[in-house]
Amino acid sequence: MAVSYHFRPGERINEVELAAQLKVSRTPLREALNRLTTEGFLTTTANKGFFARVLEANTLFDLYELRAFLEQSAVRLACQRATDQEIAVLRDFLLEQDESGEISAGEMLKLDEEFHFRLVGLSQNEELLKTVRSISERIRFARWIDWQSRRLSHEQHLHITSLLADRKEDECAAFVLAHIQKHFDQILEIIRGAVTEIYTRNSDSPRKAR
């Protein structure tokens, strides 16, 4: 529900109503809501409860722009510093995913993040990696939205690794930029469509939080 925008951005979650709808007790529901808050899908305010996350396109743009800049720099450093063996290990990590069969959306996202962390790690710059990890935590919510494109991401990751192995620094940096920009464009498109839907859905009888 949180990912599919069942709740309007900023809307307060009615725990009693939601528990009845899902046919669960308040305790497991509260645990689930706390977990969703930790993962960035919801926000919480003391003495007021849980709220659907507000969509902040400008902030997302800034974070994705920064991420693209940093990862381009990282792959340039990786082309210069990573050993052939280290690049081979990264490629093996990707190939192992081909043999893992069907996996959940959550696992797809974890593997996607892990690839980018390993890629940036090849720059041998720990502060760069820490910054990219921090950005990933802040955009994880948005990346959930676009989880259906993970198969395409996997193919692009393999291409990035091939360019890295061939030490094609400029081409690799350009491809990483296009890779990140494409996902951001897809996320924005999905968000725009979702916002249009949730604000026109049941417009004659909007739901009220109790």
From Swiss-Prot:
Source superkingdom: Bacteria
GO MF annotation, one: DNA-binding transcription factor activity
Matches recorded under PROSITE patterns: HTH_GNTR
Keyword Transcription regulation included in the entry's annotation: yes
Database matches in InterPro entries: GntR_C (IPR011711), TF_FadR/GntR_C (IPR008920), Tscrpt_reg_HTH_GntR (IPR000524), WH-like_DNA-bd_sf (IPR036388), WH_DNA-bd_sf (IPR036390)
Entry keyword annotation includes Hydrolase: no
Keyword vocabulary terms for this entry: DNA-binding, Transcription, Transcription regulation
Signal peptide span: none
Pfam families recorded: FCD, GntR
Domain HTH gntR-type: 1-55
Annotated DNA-binding residue span(s): 15-34
Functional note: Probable regulator for the expression of the NTA monooxygenase subunits.
Protein name: Nta operon transcriptional regulator
Organism lineage: Bacteria, Pseudomonadati, Pseudomonadota, Alphaproteobacteria, Hyphomicrobiales
